[in-house]
From Swiss-Prot:
It comes from the Bacteria. The gene is rpsG. Keywords: Ribonucleoprotein, Ribosomal protein, RNA-binding, rRNA-binding, tRNA-binding. Part of the 30S ribosomal subunit. Contacts proteins S9 and S11. Disulfide bonds: none annotated. One of the primary rRNA binding proteins, it binds directly to 16S rRNA where it nucleates assembly of the head domain of the 30S subunit. Is located at the subunit interface close to the decoding center, probably blocks exit of the E-site tRNA. This is Small ribosomal subunit protein uS7. Belongs to the universal ribosomal protein uS7 family. Gene3D superfamilies: Ribosomal protein S7 domain. One of its GO terms (molecular function) is tRNA binding. InterPro entries: Ribosomal_uS7 (IPR000235), Ribosomal_uS7_bac/org-type (IPR005717), Ribosomal_uS7_CS (IPR020606), Ribosomal_uS7_dom (IPR023798), Ribosomal_uS7_dom_sf (IPR036823). GO terms for biological process: translation. The keyword RNA-binding applies. GO terms for cellular component: small ribosomal subunit.
Amino acid sequence: MPRKREVPVRPVLPDARYNSKLVSMFIHKLMRDGKKSTAESILYKAFDIINEKTGKAPLEVFEEALANVKPKLEVKSRRVGGSTYQVPTEIREARRLALAIRWMIGYARSRAEKGMDVKLAGELMDAAGQRGASVKKREDTHKMAEANKAFAHYRW
């Protein structure tokens, strides 16, 4: 590992329609092969679908969904004397957000509906309602941490 100074975190510019940094981060993760305009149109169409189906502000549903998917704990492998333990550790806020966004996009892509905008809208609405695959992933992560609570003293 290089012993140089810490790399500064690049600022995220807010998106054009909602003026939100969260939406901008989501668009960047959703983007494939540098096609940002395609990613933007997918997310904005998903927001239109959410507005149509729920009648709520799509940004509120989006933020609620992210809050419901963000994990608080995760397990990290730690090798102690020949055996590997799954040690539960708390997650810092930036990683919580990154994991939540990654999980939501991943599970939206694997949904059965037709069209990414419909898939993403469905996953966002499910996550906002405390159901869906991404919320289950968070629950599974927390269960793993709870099951390995005995190894918490191996934290570093």
